Each structure stands twice: as structure tokens, then as C-alpha cells.
Curated annotation (Swiss-Prot):
GO terms for cellular component: extracellular region. This is Protein CAP22. Glycans are attached at N55, N72. It comes from the Eukaryota. It is found in: Secreted, Cell wall. Keywords: Cell wall, Glycoprotein, Secreted. Residues 143-162 are annotated as: Disordered. The gene is CAP22. The keyword Cell inner membrane does not apply.
């Protein structure tokens, strides 16, 4: 009986895994390296409307969040998450360990390998533009997310969305420009570049960009201007 209780507790721990980083919980020394991961988590987090007919269970929400975060290829999520995790582990005071829950969930859910924080990585992190599509329905789950430290080979990822909401965060290189958020709603299929995320197995697909492609192209043009 006790073994069953432990097993059920482990399953329950997977549900409601918040993949967002609380801005107030990120030490100032880690702001730059963690900013892309924080923005990605905020973009990807699903907030179902109460009563929405979308099989809106906690488990589905976790799966949608995890696929969005773990398979993102707009920047090196695997490396930045590990760098952020290392920095926060070093800088977060012992009496504020709950601040690590978000980044720990990302590392665990995505199966990313730990690494040592290098302050030199912050310069490249400051120039990162985070592009992501928030998933909203079970029909968009096309990727199997497997936690653990063993990388799984992947080629390319794609996901089809009947009603995809593309949210784009544009950030400057630290020159004082404000972040800009844009969102475009439109159908179509989004194809990503090779994803090297550990623990992620993505089905191969060959497709044409839909309306979301316009937002991405515009984002890069504006991003180049800001930089």
C-alpha cells in the first residue's frame, strides 16, 4: 500500500508542473541569462477558460506547456535553461529555494543536462529574440516529452494548428529599448529547425508556413533594427 502511495505521489508531481520563472525570484546576477527562459515560459503557459470545452485537464495543460517549451528552436533552450539553473542554484538564498521550482520543472520535464554557469554567456543571451506558439488544444500534441538526462536524436519538428496564436517577444541588446509583444492568430503549419533538446522525440514533417510566418519574418526584421 505504501509503495502505491509513493507511486501516485510521483505521478501527481508531474501534473501542474509550472514551467514559468517568477521574475521577482530571479537573482539580479541571473537576470540576463534567465530572461529568455522566463519569456518562453510566459509565452507557452496555457490558461484554460473555466468551462471551455477543450478537455482542459491539468495533465493536458502540462503536456501543452512542455511541448511548447522543450521543443522551441528560436534559441538554444537546452543550454540557456541549464545556464539559468546553475546560476540560480548558486545565487538563490537557502531560505528562498521555492524560487527554483520553475527552472527545476523545466530541467526535469525537458530532460536537459545540467551544466556550470558561465557569466560570459550573458552577452549572447541579451540579444536573443524569443519566438514561440502557445498551444491550446490536445490535437496540437505531436511530440513526446520524456524527462531524464539521456538525449534522444531528433531531426526536425512541426506542429499543425487549426487556430494558432503566435506570440512574439522582441528584446534589445541591453541598450534600453523596451520589449515588444505581438500576437498573430491564423491557421497553418509551423516547421522548426532541428531540435537538439534532450529527452524530446519529435516526428519529422515537411510543411509550408502559414500566416504565423508573417509574424516571424516581421519579428526578425524589427529585431535586426533594434540590435
Amino acid at each position: 500500500m505504501q509503495a502505491k502511495i509513493v507511486a501516485l505521489s510521483a505521478i501527481a508531481a508531474v501534473v501542474n508542473a509550472d514551467l514559468r520563472l517568477n521574475t521577482n525570484g530571479i537573482p539580479s546576477d541571473c537576470n540576463a541569462i534567465c530572461r529568455p527562459i522566463r519569456d518562453l515560459g510566459n509565452i507557452c503557459t496555457v490558461n484554460f477558460i473555466p468551462g471551455q470545452t477543450n478537455n482542459n485537464s491539468d495533465q493536458l495543460q502540462d503536456e501543452l506547456d512542455a511541448q511548447c517549451v522543450c521543443t522551441n528552436s528560436s534559441f538554444d533552450v537546452k543550454n540557456l535553461a541549464a545556464q539559468c539553473s546553475s546560476c540560480m542554484s548558486q545565487k538563490v538564498p537557502s531560505d528562498q529555494q521555492r524560487s527554483l521550482e520553475g527552472i527545476n520543472s523545466i530541467m526535469s520535464q525537458c530532460g536537459f543536462q545540467a551544466t556550470s554557469y558561465a557569466s560570459s554567456a550573458t552577452s549572447s543571451a541579451n540579444t536573443i529574440i524569443v519566438l514561440a506558439t502557445r498551444l491550446t488544444a490536445s490535437s496540437q500534441l505531436t511530440t513526446t516529452i520524456g524527462g531524464g538526462a539521456t538525449p534522444a536524436p531528433t531531426s526536425e519538428r512541426s506542429r499543425t494548428s487549426d487556430q494558432a496564436r503566435t506570440t512574439t517577444f522582441l528584446t534589445s541588446n541591453g541598450g534600453g529599448f523596451p520589449s515588444i509583444a505581438t500576437s498573430t492568430i491564423g491557421g497553418g503549419r509551423e516547421t522548426g529547425s532541428p531540435n537538439a533538446a534532450a529527452g524530446v522525440v519529435a516526428p519529422g514533417s515537411n510543411s509550408v508556413l502559414g500566416a504565423a510566418g508573417l509574424a516571424v519574418a516581421g519579428a526578425f526584421a524589427l529585431g535586426a533594427f533594434m540590435l
